[in-house]
Amino acid sequence: MKNLVPLILALTVSMSSALEDVNPDLAEITNFRQYSDTFASAGQPTREQFQTIADNGFERVVYIAFTNNQNALPDADLIVKGLDMEYMQVPVDFSNPLPDEFYAFADAMERNKDKKTLLHCQVNARATAFSFLYRVIYDDISISEAKADMNTVWQPNEVWRDFIFEILANNEIDPNCSSCDWTLPPPRQ
């Protein structure tokens, strides 16, 4: 047990070290994660938080859920465009994510790689999975670093784990690493 404490502390520090320091106002957004100077993901921002996002230099907002979700803002496109940011939506069904949806997002990112982008969904589960894939495939971030960042928000369920594995396999990337645990979370009660 005595040897476990330093190991747990080291893992905690290494898991959080890949994420950038965050402006406290942005940290108020549900599960906000800053991966680099130009890329972040989050859950659903409020109307007011979109102003904070714009004030922090974001130039593009990509929404990967449906506008009829409980906390969604049906006029988010107008809010974002009204703040002089680009808006893109790729509706991703949480129970059935498709490769074409990920590649639509990735293609948009690759066209303007330096555009400061917030990728968001409802709670940052879809968005962290897409962020994980994008960072590993296009930004050459290690599987272990990207997985640790994703795990600060959630551990993918079977549908999302299989989706992640499919996209990685399509790109000839092995999902395994020494610190990666792809064990499924316990079923919800």
List PLM regions with ranges.
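Cys-dependent protein tyrosine phosphatase-like superfamily
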Residues: A18-T117, F132-Q189
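Universal eukaryotic N-terminal targeting presequences
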Residues: M1-K2, A18
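Sec-dependent signal peptide recognition
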Residues: K2-I8
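Hydrophobic h-region of N-terminal signal peptides that target proteins for export
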Residues: I8-S17
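A phosphate-binding catalytic loop at a beta-strand-loop-alpha-helix junction
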Residues: T117-F130
